[in-house]
Regions:
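C-terminal helical cap(s) of enzyme catalytic domains, especially alpha/beta-barrels
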Residues: 69-72, 307-320, 374-377, 386
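Glycine- and acidic
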Residues: 149-154, 158, 244-251, 359-362
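Intrinsic disorder/low-complexity segments
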Residues: 177-214, 388-400
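Conserved, mostly hydrophobic/aromatic
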Residues: 24, 56, 91, 133, ...
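Short, electropositive alpha-helical surface patch
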Residues: 154-166, 173-174, 229-240, 361, ...
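Non-catalytic, usually N-terminal nucleic-acid engagement modules in DNA/RNA processing proteins
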Residues: 1-184, 324-327
């Protein structure tokens, strides 16, 4: 058994569902914080649990380079290595290799690239990417794909889409032959995390035996900014057969309006009974917008990356805490936010921490931004539970 997914309610194309995975029962739509190297930057695991994070991401490319897949595998996979007993998704490393355009060579077999750490040469293929992700042991893993740059010539996009389809078939073949090698010990048990409501802050532990449970491999739809190629990619990926489908290759520099157009048109071609994952987006307003279109899963580095640069999301709009006007501001960061940061600290103190380059500033900023994102998705789920005509979620911000 890999995953099960059910849709409990709809409002137009938006869906309210439950995704059951080996390590957690995930309420959807869901935002997934990104932990590139098995760490959500500046935020410890116990804080993530308090914030209600149901599922987080790890990055295969970075973990392959350091500490190495074998190190993680010997410790029971990422769950044991990072002491996280909720769900995890790993990407295939394809996007990161794509970003190393000056350091990589691509052919039918796979991609040869140089490490950004020490310049050493490495090779990723669909098979080796699956081998690495099986060793990392996430609940959901991703097929190996290629992401095209923006803008790109139509011939280049077609060639890349067709390569991704062939790699998807190879990814699934290897996965089906080796999925039993996941580092969960046969007969071992885990404190399975269950949440039955839209809150998801207080997940209840239940003991689950891992016998019979496997990872789930998602296929990825590519095709650049061409709706026809996206349709063809979706059809070919569905023909291969996966328990879930991702929309990749977006947020690579294209206008937001074009992103929405491609997401909306691609969703029309994806199965309604399978989870849909939009990779690498976006702002709080955007994740509400994409949930309203029928996306079930989203991830983005923005909340923590922006936090480290002093950009904070609030119900009153974005705040650049580095600005001098906050130096004497005794008010909370967001008067409508109930996170631990807004309950305790003033804008003046947060501005002081940033100006002083104190690490605590990065921690508190990151905790707030993640809380804002996760609370936004909780409100989206609550609005769908209430069968509203469209999801709402970002307090005080105009609907997209």
């Amino acid at each position: 058994m890999s995953l099960s997914f059910r849709v409990d309610n709809t409002a137009g194309p938006a869906r309210r569902g439950v995704l059951s995975l080996p390590h957690a029962e995930v309420q959807t739509p869901v935002f997934m914080p990104v932990g590139t190297v098995a760490s959500i930057k500046a935020v410890p695991q116990e804080t993530l649990e308090e914030l209600g994070a149901q599922i987080i991401l790890g990055n295969t490319y970075h973990l392959y380079l350091r500490p190495g897949v074998e190190t993680v595998r010997k410790m029971g996979g990422l769950h044991g290595f990072m002491s996280w007993n909720r769900a995890i998704l790993t990407d295939s490393g394809g996007f990161q290799v794509f970003s190393l355009s000056e350091l990589r060579k691509l052919n039918e077999d796979g991609v040869t690239f140089r490490s950004h750490l020490d310049g050493s040469s490495h090779f990723f293929s669909p098979e080796s990417a699956m081998q690495a992700q099986i060793g990392l042991g996430a609940d959901i893993i991703m097929a190996f794909d290629e992401c095209t740059e923006y803008p790109a010539e139509s011939a280049r996009v077609r060639e890349s889409m067709e390569l991704t389809a062939r790699w998807a078939a190879r990814s699934r073949k290897y996965f089906e032959e080796h999925k039993h090698e996941v580092p969960w010990k046969a007969g071992s048990t885990v404190k399975f995390q269950v949440s039955s409501d839209a809150n998801s802050r207080n997940l209840k532990p239940e003991t689950r035996n891992f016998d019979g449970y496997t990872q789930s491999l998602f296929g990825i739809v590519q095709g650049g900014m061409d709706p026809a190629l996206r349709k063809e990619s979706a059809e070919r990926t569905i023909e291969i057969g996966f328990p879930g489908y991702a929309i990749g290759g977006l947020s690579v520099g294209e206008p937001r309006e074009l992103t929405r157009e491609i997401v909306e048109s691609t969703l029309e071609h994806l199965p309604k009974d399978k989870p849909r994952y939009l990779m690498g987006v976006g702002t709080p307003e955007e994740i509400v917008e994409y949930a309203s279109l029928g996306v079930d899963m989203m991830d983005c580095v923005l909340p923590t990356r922006a936090a480290r640069h002093g950009l904070l999301f609030t119900s009153e709009g974005k705040i650049s805490i580095k600005q001098a006007r906050y130096a004497q501001d005794q008010g909370p960061l967001d008067p409508n936010c109930d996170c631990r940061v807004c309950r305790r600290y003033s804008r003046a103190y947060l501005r002081h921490l940033y100006a002083s380059n104190e690490l605590l500033g990065q921690v508190l900023n990151s905790v707030h931004n993640l809380s804002f994102y996760l609370d936004t998705m909780r409100r989206v789920r609550a609005s769908l539970d209430a069968t509203s005509t469209r999801p709402s979620g970002v307090q005080g911000c105009p609907e997209p």
